[in-house]
């Protein structure tokens, strides 16, 4: 047997023990809470004493920039994979198949394994492979399997789930506390569908949205009281964040982006369409019709930006994925795309350019690993995954985040930095990569 083959056998023998063996010493658990659609400044026109005290006792970001496209499932998956959307593949809230033209709504898509399990490994599975137990409560992507592995503890919301029930919210918090205490879970992701639902229905500037933010704040207070009541304050780090913001929909008739009214455009030229979902649109023209459809649409409306897939702005980190169609488009802030008929009537919407301030969201963190009274500069949500891996002391999967971006918010010595065991894992992976090229 040659030297390369011997090294390969040794590396393959050692690597599983390093990855799946006893983890480095960890003292702290982690709870990631997402309040869907919580715009970065929602706490500025409402009294939020619990979020305020959390900032005083922990870390607050001026705001957090979500990934593009600013939709619920794609942005939530970025948080737990550390990847831009074009790299993790959950490119839309809706499952779609361009061959069969099947399109499934948001709730149905939550249970479609192949939509989520497409090559990226979320933090639940990474942590479990390194000896930890994890949980997901209503968090998008948390109730399917990845490479055959399921999250240790999981709950999935029903199709007709009432997002607004504050009593249920407290019950969900109680369940999560039991997971930490009775099931020895180290990581839980907890999802609430508000204030997104209220923002959609009534608009982000409405009194109803303001009232819902007060409910969110009361729930934050209940959560922090529960942590203290269960004596977890010294062993549990808490992160509260969101997926995206919200903006008011422009409903002025003369400004509507309506495909069925565009001159020289016909759906007879289209093989597949994904429209009528906020400001994002995807089209597959019929064979030989790409240039014609593109030329008709590219200047069809001053608020609509239409691109060939290969020309879509690279800074969005969105179009370079097999699931993205040959024609891709988005509209300006406040303008939604109507297809064959007008079926969108929300007063609030998201999905827009992630550089628009209305799409920015919140980040708060408190616990034994975080500094107190620190406000940090804005950052991208893609970096949160690396932070969570540091807090849990686990080796991250390959990702697009930078582990140094958020490290300054941690107390000195509190981050579970890579141990010698983790360096050995990296070394062995490097050996395997090199050997694969010569064998």
Curated annotation (Swiss-Prot):
Zn(2+) 1 binds at residues 36, 72, 243-244. Choline-specific phosphodiesterase that hydrolyzes sphingomyelin releasing the ceramide and phosphocholine and therefore is involved in sphingomyelin digestion, ceramide formation, and fatty acid (FA) absorption in the gastrointestinal tract. Also has phospholipase C activity and can also cleave phosphocholine from palmitoyl lyso-phosphatidylcholine and platelet-activating factor (PAF) leading to its inactivation. Does not have nucleotide pyrophosphatase activity. Expressed in liver and small intestine. This is Ectonucleotide pyrophosphatase/phosphodiesterase family member 7. Disruption phenotype: Mutant mice are born at the expected Mendelian rate, are viable and fertile, are grown normally without obvious abnormalities. Mice shown signs of hypertrophy of the intestinal epithelium, as the widths of the villi and crypts, as well as the thickness of muscle layer under the crypts appear increased. However, no spontaneous tumorigenesis either in the small intestine or in the colon is identifiedknockout mice up to the age of 10 months. Residues 1-21 form the signal peptide. Gene3D superfamilies: 3.30.1360.180, Alkaline Phosphatase, subunit A. Substrate binds at residue 93. It catalyses: a sphingomyelin + H2O = phosphocholine + an N-acylsphing-4-enine + H(+); a 1-O-alkyl-2-acetyl-sn-glycero-3-phosphocholine + H2O = a 1-O-alkyl-2-acetyl-sn-glycerol + phosphocholine + H(+); 1-O-octadecyl-2-acetyl-sn-glycero-3-phosphocholine + H2O = 1-O-octadecyl-2-acetyl-sn-glycerol + phosphocholine + H(+); 1-hexadecanoyl-sn-glycero-3-phosphocholine + H2O = 1-hexadecanoyl-sn-glycerol + phosphocholine + H(+). Residues 22-414 are extracellular. It is found in: Cell membrane. The lineage of its organism: Eukaryota, Metazoa, Chordata, Craniata, Vertebrata.
